[in-house]
Amino acid sequence: MLSEEILKRAEDLARRCEGRGTPTNTGFLTPAERYALEHDQALREANMVFHGGHPDAERCIAFFLPDWMEADALDVSEHIRAIRLTAAFGEPGHRDYMGAILGMGVGREWVGDILVEGHEAIVLCQPSVLRHLLSIDKVGRCGVKAVEIALSEIPVRGKKTEERRFTVMSPRLDAVAAGLFHLSRTEVTRQIAAGLIQLNYTECLKPDAPVKEGDVLTLRGTGKGKVAGIGGSSRKGRMFVTAELYK
């Protein structure tokens, strides 16, 4: 679905929640779709929370709650389930697991993160497709065994990050991306022109686009990072930037 369709659907769900006084929810959203919802003016008054089944989830479901309901009253396990797939041999990759899931006719919006570690993977999904995913017995060329596990059994791995500190003349996309990804401004300019750099999960072709604290920069094929802080200046008048590069 396009971002506009996602926003329209979310706004409809928010109105339904308000009108009926009962919770509503989307399917699993990409980080870009979540960002769009978080910054949609039509949803600024909505009691909206996001859950992905584990603390560091990238793909999340947006829940719209009525005014009488607190966020901690939401039972996430009623909406998100987890499956552990264990390979009999070999170590299938993320693409292999995704191929097996899509091959069963399960839409991507029904599936959350796929956490791959060695010969195992944990798949987050909505309850309506749980039975289908539990029937998976082969991923790529590897036989697998699928079992449901509780969300509490998902290992807490945490995001591995590397702190980056650098200075810029001004907090614009090309300058911040160069410091974050350790690239020359010339190379970054080429990457931006090629559409390989995203600002807050959206392709940005403007080298001078302003970057602020909390923004996420993504370089396709390399990784992504988040701007943790911008402020202060060096003796030469350059601004200090602190960022976290996700590994």
Residue ranges of predicted features:
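Ferredoxin-like alpha/beta domains used as RNA- or RNAP-binding modules
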Residues: M1-D174, L180, E203, G223-K247
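Basic (Lys/Arg-enriched) interaction patch that binds polyanionic ligands
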Residues: S170-G221
